[in-house]
Amino acid sequence: MAAVAAAPGPGEAGESEQDSKTTPGEWRLGELQCEPIVAVLDSERQSLIRCEMDSDTLEKAGPVVEQLGGSGTDQVYGIDKNSDFESVSVMDYKPPYRGINQERIAGENKKARHEQLPRHTFLQKEPTPMILSEVRDSGVHTEMCLEEATLSSNNDGSETSLNDPDCDIGSMGTSEGSVVTSGIGSLIPGSEVQVTLDHIIQDALVVSFCHGNRIFSGVLMDLSKRFGPHGIPVTVHPRREYKNKPVESIQEESKSFHEETLLKSEENVTPPEDVTPIQQSESCEIQNLWTTKPPPLFHEGAPYPPPLFIRDTYNQSIPQPPPRKIKRPKKKIYREEPTSIINAIKLRPRQVLCDKCKNNVVADKKEIRKVATDSYKTEEGKRRRHETITTVNKKLKTDHKVNGKGQHESQKRAGVTKVPNLAHGRGKVVKVPSQTSAAKTQLHTKKVLQNKNMDHVKAREVLKMAKEKAQKKQKVTTSSKNAHSKVHFTRRLQNSNSGTLPPRLRIKPQRYRNEENDSSLKPGLETLRSSKMGIKPQTRYSATRSAGEAPSEIQSPSNGPEEVSSEIQDTNVCVPPEEQDLQQTLGKRGSKSNITVYMAINQKKANSSSASVCSSDSTDDMKSSHSECSSTENFDFPPGSMHTPSSSSASSKEEKKLSNSLKIKMFSKNVSKCVTPDGRTICVGDIVWAKIYGFPWWPARILAITISRKDNGLLIRQEARISWFGSPTTSFLALSQLAPFLENFQSRFNKKRKGLYRKAITEAAKAAKQLTPEVRALLTQFET
């Protein structure tokens, strides 16, 4: 390396002699082709002191004596000898030792880095790292010297190393004389050397080592802080896991390593006699290359150094572990997302009806299916009747005879219907059953009709129409009396001047038979079923009105429409054998295959506003008749509906008793809490598990509780209206189908379900926690 004292600028070669005659009291700055540094010469231009600075730092260091020649980056400055040289800051390169005033220099370095001041630098093609060293003189002043840490050479040989023996530094030694120069080839890793302790700085020791004509200085750092010297790989010391090992084993390992290295060094130092000096020099060069080989970037087992330690050491190899793999969290793919969407769709139940409404819907569907076939049969029957049969008017007359012969005969009393044979003018006799069986039939009929949800407004309209028709029938009675064939009853009405009787109510119980009303049919209609099985065609014709018959054609001789309560029995039917064939054919041609029963309604008032009229055979009219009969007005079905007010007082009392016994009263009440048959207490606001067919157990909240009882106190049902969590729908369920939420959580909760199910469970759990006993007591404090 060419270190020229006070190197002049371009074109100033003649001034080199003048620069060489500088006085000892003057410090000079010169050019050094190395890293961006500034070279400082001592008074004798022998020692080079590396010091990188900017113009501001140079002014702080001391007064500028002169500015020598040069331009651009080759400007050379001079500073006074008496200035404090250690205050000059080091910018980019941080050597292990920076002089005596270590702390003050470090503070100025940090300040200079933050200010980002422009600096005057000297560039070099291939930078060479430098290490500062301090040489103590006999006391005149402190001198600094520069030592290269690595060997570098140029192709043209323009640069020379400070290791060159031509560079005389003997005058920097002690006052006794110069130190004999010798190389470092004799030093090997693991050998023991004697160093001088210069400074003690917290966890570091500044030491210097003299070897021949060379002086080395460095810092020994405390390894307990988990980091080593700058850029020097740890070879002698064990790995960083030494804390877990005992101290004795570490010392033994280090001793064994030293012994091995000493043996190797002895073999290398004592070459055989036949080895030439050229081979010795080559081996020395190989050893030097091994010692100066740059350490690897990473070391297995080395700790992570502190961040500031890394920041202060640029372009150097620092012992640190290999880079760790960055663990990136993988995005979780929810496999059950599509199922959660399906659950959201399924959350609106396909069957939101309770059991009672579900049965009604099923019955309506069955009727709709029958509409197509029944309507087709009705049209065919009408067409055939119009071709073969003329218009038939039936005039119904009722006759009640007072029989005083005894109670036995009054019990046997029954109405006989005479139906004329259209071809021969003959008729058949049908006996009407007893009063109690008719009352049972009427009660069953009322129950069937009340089970259907019908429109009350339509019922009132039909009742008004029935009144008008009844008045018209009274006017046309005499004119049409002898025009058509008639239907006579053997018993006449005694009190012919009595008020208008209620219109007829036609019921077809076979059509509406289902699971619910089958049980109620058994006690009252056993004879009716037997008659249907025995002579089905005859009963069809005898009890069913023709489809072509108009409502206005129903007439009575004097008192308008008369009431008949009839029920068919197979033992009471008398049909001549010659008429059976015709009756069977007519029965087959009929529009309906069901039995039509005409039932009378006993009125408590003179008007017929509380009565219902069913006067057509078509299916649509039957539906309207259900709506007519489902009004909120009270109906009484006494067994003796055929009797007039002129009957005996004993029979009227019996009728009242029977009618009261046949009435079924049911009372419903909304309560805030109730006890289930299994002993559980359920309150309004409770969180429960509920189940609907096709869905899992789902959390719900009880909104209301309804208890239904008979008039004798017998419990009929306990029902709750619930709202589902995560859904706006509500449902009516029996209390027996509900289970407490918290008590049955483990058995009801399904871990596999996600989405809205989990959301509903979370909401229900929060609501259950908020439902404390105090809140529950407040909710059930008042009965509704």
Curated annotation (Swiss-Prot):
Keywords: Nucleus, Transcription, Transcription regulation. GO terms for cellular component: chromocenter; nucleus. Its main location: nucleus. This is PWWP domain-containing protein 2A. Residues 1-29, 399-443, 468-570, 609-655 are annotated as: Disordered. Disulfide bonds: none annotated. The keyword Transcription applies. One of its GO terms (biological process) is chromatin remodeling. It comes from Xenopus laevis (African clawed frog). GO terms for molecular function: chromatin binding; histone H3K36me3 reader activity.
